[in-house]
Amino acid sequence: MENISDLWNSALKELEKKVSKPSYETWLKSTTAHNLKKDVLTITAPNEFARDWLESHYSELISETLYDLTGAKLAIRFIIPQSQAEEEIDLPPSKPNSAQDDSNHLPQSMLNPKYTFDTFVIGSGNRFAHAASLAVAEAPAKAYNPLFIYGGVGLGKTHLMHAIGHYVIEHNPNAKVVYLSSEKFTNEFINSIRDNKAVDFRNKYRNVDVLLIDDIQFLAGKEQTQEEFFHTFNALHEESKQIVISSDRPPKEIPTLEDRLRSRFEWGLITDITPPDLETRIAILRKKAKAEGLDIPNEVMLYIANQIDSNIRELEGALIRVVAYSSLINKDINADLAAEALKDIIPNSKPKIISIYDIQKAVGDVYQVKLEDFKAKKRTKSVAFPRQIAMYLSRELTDSSLPKIGEEFGGRDHTTVIHAHEKISKLLKTDTQLQKQVEEINDILK
């Protein structure tokens, strides 16, 4: 891997001479070499937009530059960090009892060097998840085991998992840390059965110190893989090895997940990550700009942060898009230029943000229920049923976590919210009167 990095660094020095400084700073400086397989050099771009731009505008120039350096005609492929994490890694040929050696090769290959605790921006939506991750990294298998982190796409779950891995390796270089997606776990498991190497597969993942497994929800419906992961989990937990799991939803909401797995995921700590608030989004943009050596006016930071509120990946992508647009038309970056650069990805009128309070008020109007009754202990049908409808709509129409929804309904447990959602979802399939009432509530909320 060191030789590939040296080659790419040499290529970057040559490319810096061939393109303008803004273009180099915007597109090429932040790239890294990932691997070289069969005359295909894979380069990591910081985000999706940068990847697409590099593919369409710089592939030929990069290929020519590499030919000048090596005399070999290499094809160029670009990936982003998320897909890099799921790339197949070329490991040394398997040998008898070599599972532990294989594990030692994985950490450096599979962890993104940019995803550390130092580069993670802490805000109200991720503060607890960050604290829990740091506690796990400082004392693996002693703080929370397993640690289960859930939240939407692009909110920092993978970043925290990689940060845990980096921290453990930094403080214990001999630690065997493995990061992979559940999809990769599934594919390797299937291949091990096909190639009659099930024992090697088990040794590989049951002889590690820290297992970081991403997107566990993709195990849903895969009975054999769930069975294998169940035994892997047990083996590691019994040996006091740390397990960290991420998902886009809490364990109880993962469909067709075996109860015995679900219960094990709940043994340790479950924490969520929610979309960043305005202050956190601005802090993320400032940190990104500083890391990339970009001089971005505060008004532009504020504009982007106000317009992009879904996730961190889109936020950083918007910043790069603005910088790229500025370099292309050779104009200084300001709020007007940012608006022009982002006009294709920002709708003219942003959809109305609906709060749990709005939902309670609308449901109360339709069912003649007082606002305070939604939080009260009353269990009469005239109150309990509208309350369940309000919980259902809160789950459907807001980004609030289950605990947050429960809190807004008088501090009820998240399982109560799940039950309400399941009940109303089922009734809506057959109850035409309920369908009309929910439609009426939705009209009020528009």
Curated annotation (Swiss-Prot):
It is found in: Cytoplasm. Residues 96-107 have a biased composition (Polar residues). Transmembrane segments: none annotated. Gene3D superfamilies: 1.10.1750.10, 1.10.8.60, 3.30.300.180, P-loop containing nucleotide triphosphate hydrolases. ATP binds at residues 154, 156-158. SUPFAM superfamilies: P-loop containing nucleoside triphosphate hydrolases, TrpR-like. Residues 327-446 are annotated as: Domain IV, binds dsDNA. Keywords: ATP-binding, Cytoplasm, DNA replication, DNA-binding, Lipid-binding, Nucleotide-binding. GO terms for cellular component: cytoplasm; plasma membrane. Residues 1-92 are annotated as: Domain I, interacts with DnaA modulators. The keyword Iron does not apply. Disulfide bonds: none annotated. GO terms for biological process: DNA replication initiation; regulation of DNA replication. Residues 87-107 are annotated as: Disordered. One of its GO terms (molecular function) is DNA replication origin binding. Residues 93-109 are annotated as: Domain II. Residues 110-326 are annotated as: Domain III, AAA+ region. Oligomerizes as a right-handed, spiral filament on DNA at oriC. Belongs to the DnaA family. Plays an essential role in the initiation and regulation of chromosomal replication. ATP-DnaA binds to the origin of replication (oriC) to initiate formation of the DNA replication initiation complex once per cell cycle. Binds the DnaA box (a 9 base pair repeat at the origin) and separates the double-stranded (ds)DNA. Forms a right-handed helical filament on oriC DNA; dsDNA binds to the exterior of the filament while single-stranded (ss)DNA is stabiized in the filament's interior. Domain I is involved in oligomerization and binding regulators, domain II is flexibile and of varying length in different bacteria, domain III forms the AAA+ region, while domain IV binds dsDNA. This is Chromosomal replication initiator protein DnaA. It comes from Bacillus cereus (strain AH187).
